[in-house]
């Protein structure tokens, strides 16, 4: 009888150990293990927790998929430094009389009357 009880207890203990090991193998091994989330689950997680759950790989992919920023002027003939310097100096050397000749006060008078 005593041998039968110890055999049953040993069998039950081994069974419980194997069941525990079998169930623990499907548990996440790491705290932040990457999972395959469905799109609906991702939308839920984004709404509930912000963008914390998006994986680093998808962030890197988003950055690599973006188009490169374009230049402001699509003109392929850019000014050289000496050309830009001469244009700047010419604009700085304009006399104040030339600017006053181009100044049209009637335009401002019409605008102020319209906005009155």
Swiss-Prot record:
Location of Glutamine amide modifications: 49
InterPro entries per record: Spexin (IPR028126)
Subcellular location: Secreted; Secreted, Extracellular space; Cytoplasmic vesicle, Secretory vesicle
GO biological process: long-chain fatty acid import into cell; negative regulation of appetite; negative regulation of heart rate; negative regulation of renal sodium excretion; positive regulation of gastro-intestinal system smooth muscle contraction; positive regulation of systemic arterial blood pressure; regulation of sensory perception of pain
Induction per the UniProt record: Down-regulated in omental and subcutaneous fat of obese subjects.
Proregion positions: 27-35, 50-116, 74-116
Lineage: superkingdom: Eukaryota
Record-given protein name: Spexin
Species of origin: Homo sapiens (Human)
Taxonomic lineage of the native organism: Eukaryota, Metazoa, Chordata, Craniata, Vertebrata
